């Protein structure tokens, strides 16, 4: 018999908000009696955008901007119905993207 598992993947641009959200999820799951592994930090995705500083010429003068996407992974093993219910009611910040797989 395979174990039931909920896999939660969090993404955010700000790592502080991401870590706070992960701690809320872990605390809520542990309070309801489920076994939690994580938060596991996944590799940070770094996207670099290069643009010209000038409008028409001066191609050698460029500026670079980067956007970092931080990720965390949380596994909840053998969740109870109370665990699922409490996770559904959990209020998280708006800057965090949550992906849940059952």
UniProtKB/Swiss-Prot annotation:
GO terms for molecular function: structural constituent of ribosome; tRNA binding. SUPFAM superfamilies: Ribosomal protein S10 (SSF54999). InterPro entries: Ribosomal_uS10 (IPR001848), Ribosomal_uS10_CS (IPR018268), Ribosomal_uS10_dom (IPR027486), Ribosomal_uS10_dom_sf (IPR036838). The keyword Transcription does not apply. The keyword Membrane does not apply. Keywords: Ribonucleoprotein, Ribosomal protein. GO terms for cellular component: ribonucleoprotein complex; ribosome. Pfam families: Ribosomal_S10. One of its GO terms (biological process) is translation. Belongs to the universal ribosomal protein uS10 family. Part of the 30S ribosomal subunit. NCBIfam families: PRK00596.1 (NF001861), rpsJ_bact (TIGR01049). Involved in the binding of tRNA to the ribosomes. This is Small ribosomal subunit protein uS10.
């Amino acid at each position: 018999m395979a174990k039931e598992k909920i896999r939660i993947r969090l993404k955010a641009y700000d790592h502080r908000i991401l870590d706070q959200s992960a701690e809320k999820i872990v605390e809520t799951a542990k309070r309801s009696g489920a076994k939690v592994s994580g938060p596991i930090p996944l590799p940070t995705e770094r996207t670099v955008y290069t643009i010209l500083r000038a409008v028409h010429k001066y191609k050698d003068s460029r500026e670079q901007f980067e956007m970092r996407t931080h990720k965390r992974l949380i596994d909840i093993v053998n969740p109870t119905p109370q665990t699922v219910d409490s996770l559904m009611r959990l209020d998280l910040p708006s800057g965090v993207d949550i992906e849940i797989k059952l």
